[in-house]
Design a protein with these regions (language model features):
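Short acidic N-proximal helix/loop "leader" segments that mark the beginning
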Residues: 1-31
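Acyltransferase donor/substrate-recognition loop-hinge adjacent to the catalytic core
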Residues: 16-24, 116-119, 203-209
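Short amphipathic alpha-helix that is part of the acyltransferase structural core
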Residues: 21-75, 79-84, 89
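Sequence-level motif detector for i,i+2 pairs with an aromatic at +2
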Residues: 31-34, 78, 90, 123, ...
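Conserved GNAT-family N-acetyltransferase fold
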Residues: 81, 93, 131
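Short, His- and charge-rich active-site/binding loops that engage polyanionic ligands
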Residues: 85-117
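Acyl-donor binding region in acyl/amide transferases
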Residues: 106-200, 205
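Acidic/histidine-enriched, glycine/proline-rich intrinsically disordered or flexible terminal extensions
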Residues: 205-239
C-alpha cells in the first residue's frame, strides 16, 4: 500500500460496477445454460482439446497426427479459458504474458516483441492464441462472455497490451472488441495472411467509439494513456 494515501475500506465505484457487471454476465450465462471455466497453468484442459480438434481439423478437412497438433508445451504455462455447455467446451482462448522464454521464442518474432521489451516489462504484454468456437455456438453472447473473461484476466494480471494474430475473416470479430492492426499482415508459407492486432487495456475512448462490450469492464482509464501514446509513437498504429 502506498504510504501517502489513506486506506479506504470501501471499494471504488468502478470496482463495484465491475463486480455488478460480472454478476450480471454470470446470471445471463446461467440463463443460457452456460458457464465460464478458467484453466490455470498446468490444469488438465478437460474438453478443450476436443473443441480445438473439431474446429481446426474437422471443419477444414485436415487430419493426421491431431493429438500433437491441438496441444503443445505452452498449454502447461498458459491460462486457458472455456465457455462450457454441460460437459462440452463450446468456445476457448489461451492466454500468456511474454515473461516466459518459451512464449518469447514461439511468438516474439511474429509480434515484434523486442520493441515492446525496450519500454515495457514483458509480463505486461500478453498474447491470445488457440481461439476456437464450436460451429453451432457462434453467437454474440458466447463470444462476448469469452472475451469479457479474457479482459478480466488481463486486468487482474496488470496487462497493458493484449496481442493476437488472426486470419482476415476474423478481423471484424476482434475489431468489434477493440483490437486494431498495429503491424502489416504477416505472410505465412503458402501465402496465408495473418493480421497482427493489439488491444490496449483500459482504452476508454476507443472501446467506447467502437461499441466494444468490454467498455463496461473498464476500471482505470488513466492506465491506458501512456500505453496508447507509446504504441502510436512506436508503430504509428493509432490515431
Amino acid at each position: 500500500m502506498e504510504q501517502d494515501k489513506p486506506f479506504n475500506h470501501r471499494p471504488s465505484s468502478s470496482a463495484r460496477e465491475a463486480r455488478l457487471v460480472a454478476a450480471s454476465a454470470d446470471e445471463a450465462m446461467v440463463g443460457l445454460g452456460l458457464r465460464m471455466h478458467r484453466f490455470a497453468p498446468g490444469d488438465c484442459l478437460g474438453d478443450v482439446p476436443r473443441l480445438r480438434r473439431e474446429v481446426y481439423f474437422h471443419e477444414r478437412g485436415q487430419f493426421g497426427d491431431r493429438s500433437k497438433r491441438v496441444t503443445d508445451g505452452l498449454d502447461a504455462c498458459g491460462t486457458t479459458l472455456a465457455v462450457e455447455k454441460g460437459t462440452q467446451a463450446i468456445a476457448t482462448l489461451r492466454l500468456h504474458d511474454f515473461a516466459p522464454l518459451a512464449v518469447q521464442v514461439e511468438y516474439g518474432s511474429l509480434f515484434q516483441i523486442d520493441a515492446f521489451a525496450r519500454s515495457w516489462p514483458l509480463a505486461q504484454v500478453a498474447v491470445g492464441t488457440r481461439f476456437a468456437v464450436q460451429a453451432d455456438q457462434r453467437s454474440k453472447p458466447v463470444v462476448d462472455r469469452l472475451m469479457e473473461e479474457a479482459y478480466r484476466w488481463a486486468q487482474e494480471s496488470r496487462i497493458q497490451f493484449c496481442l493476437l494474430a488472426c486470419e482476415p475473416f476474423l478481423h471484424d470479430v476482434f475489431e468489434h472488441y477493440g483490437f486494431r492492426e498495429y503491424l502489416p499482415p504477416a505472410i505465412l508459407p503458402g501465402g496465408v495472411d495473418l493480421l497482427r492486432m493489439v488491444l490496449v487495456i483500459e482504452d476508454e475512448p476507443f472501446l467506447s467509439e467502437c461499441g466494444s462490450p468490454l467498455h463496461r469492464l473498464i476500471r482505470d482509464p488513466a492506465r491506458a494513456l501512456p500505453a496508447k501514446a507509446w504504441l502510436t509513437r512506436s508503430f504509428n498504429a493509432l490515431s
